[in-house]
């Protein structure tokens, strides 16, 4: 079924907060939504498909598109560039698809400061300790990399107030219900005391 009023939803979270899991669960049962496919200058990893996981382009092509104003947001991460093409969003809107845009705070602030209409959600972990445990349980990062992600998380959580909605991902099933409620009703009561407690925990750990 086509969506007559497609929308853009921007989702951000510290690494380990469970953002990817929530998005994946939501998309698996909502066919009118698609995950935005970013353009990047980094080479494909094993198993990645051009146009599915990313749009892989050269540095020169990226620079050309940037000069043309083709991106709604872009950033440099670990010596590679990433960006969201306006043409991709427009194409999906014409098809009646709403877009889930999974980006960091830096990218979101570019969109927030533009005239692009969107609804935004920031996902918080229940505590600093739980965030670190989730990162360690992945068993994919070195201790140094985990510490770097935790340091980044401290910076990122301070921007939660810039977003329209905040979800505390303590229980996945409850979090996905809240996620869906926000997407479909634009309504969610924020427990400010809980948010402040989490922030104090993360910033003072």
What are these regions (language model features)?
Residues 19:
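Conserved lysine of the Walker
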Residues 31-44:
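Short beta-strand-centered segment that lines the nucleotide-binding/catalytic pocket of NTP-utilizing
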